[in-house]
């Protein structure tokens, strides 16, 4: 039977009816009987978690399908119906085979350098092999490649760029030639000029974005996925390394202290800011609502955060919003989430690929 829903649609704020035919939306009533699944509320495209790691957990790798499914279900329960996996050491493509799980856009494995990232998490190559590995991971992912662009340099005792700028530029150019976009892990300031000059597509974390760097990024189309709820771990990371690497520890504390101001300044400069949790490392999955609250707490207007977490974020990742013929992926809330963050905790209905899943 054809499913029917009525409510106020965002972002256009129009109250109207929609029907689901073949997993897609239509605003023209079809022939035959219909089943109304909701008759009021605020209807928005499913939320996005634009930085998570399906197949990773605080306890370690999750290679089994059941464990990965459980992680994806946590995201779905929070309203995240589109996940961008920002690198995973295990094969998580099984999640893509389940119609009841969020859509998953994969970035293959992280590309890192030996001794310059979390051990065993990424594919480790030297600079001479970076471009070739980008080719491999572009083929292994779904239009995204993930590069670790800075990490602690133990000899220097502080964060430092991982790749020479010319090599990084060649790697990003090769990804673009292959039709892939590049996301870069970067905490500090020093790796950012090379990334920006290379045409990086997505800055992950971005705590090193100074005012001058923000001015350079603005207008380029480069996005930032700040993962604020993971940045909240910086003080504990600093404490763990303080005895051996005091300069690094002080740097991490300073980055944490300015993180909210810097992301707000980036937003005010017009840089797109998208929601991502970094789930799978030190954080569990299903925390997109916490990240939304953190971004609002940083001073970004709530309506803008919801837009970037929903219809604008989906568009950035290549999916349509609530328009004729679009995939029927939406969440219905009792109140307007641009006004009430609390309503995100209790969705009335969740529809994924045209089926009611919650």
Task: Say what each PLM segment does.
Residues 55-57, 89-93, 112-114, 151-155, ...:
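Active-site environment of divalent metal-dependent phosphoester hydrolases
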């Amino acid at each position: 039977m054809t499913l029917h829903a009525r409510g106020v649609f965002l972002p256009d704020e129009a109250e109207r009816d929609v029907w689901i035919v073949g997993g897609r939306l239509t605003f023209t009533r079809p022939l035959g009987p219909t089943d109304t699944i909701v008759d009021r509320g605020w209807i928005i495209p499913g939320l996005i978690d634009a930085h998570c790691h399906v197949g990773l957990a605080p306890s370690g790798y999750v290679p089994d399908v059941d464990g990965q499914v459980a992680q994806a279900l946590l995201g779905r329960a929070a309203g995240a119906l589109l996940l961008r996996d920002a690198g995973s050491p295990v094969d998580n493509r099984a999640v893509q085979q389940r119609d009841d799980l969020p859509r998953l856009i994969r970035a293959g494995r992280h590309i890192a350098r030996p001794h310059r990232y979390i051990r065993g998490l990424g594919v480790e190559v030297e600079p001479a092999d970076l471009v070739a590995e980008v080719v491999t991971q572009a083929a292994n992912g779904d239009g995204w490649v993930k590069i670790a662009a800075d990490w602690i340099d133990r000899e220097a005792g502080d964060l430092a760029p991982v790749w020479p700028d010319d090599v990084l530029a060649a790697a990003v150019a090769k990804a673009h030639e292959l039709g892939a976009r590049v996301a870069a892990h970067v905490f500090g300031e020093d790796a950012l000029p090379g990334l920006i000059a290379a045409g990086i597509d997505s800055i992950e974390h971005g705590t090193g974005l100074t005012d001058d760097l923000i001015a350079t990024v603005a207008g380029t189309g480069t996005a930032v996925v700040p993962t604020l709820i993971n940045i909240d771990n910086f003080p504990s990371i600093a404490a763990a390394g303080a005895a051996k690497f005091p300069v690094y520890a002080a740097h991490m504390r300073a980055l944490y202290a300015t993180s909210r101001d810097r992301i707000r300044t980036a937003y005010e400069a017009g840089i797109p800011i998208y929601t991502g949790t970094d789930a799978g490392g030190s954080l569990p999955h299903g925390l997109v609502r916490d990240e939304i609250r953190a971004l609002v707490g940083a001073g970004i207007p709530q309506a803008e955060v919801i837009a970037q977490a929903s219809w604008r974020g989906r568009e950035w990742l290549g999916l349509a919003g609530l328009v004729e013929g679009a995939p029927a992926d939406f969440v219905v809330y009792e109140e307007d989430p641009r006004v009430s963050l609390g309503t995100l905790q209790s969705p009335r209905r969740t529809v994924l690929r045209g089926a009611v899943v919650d």
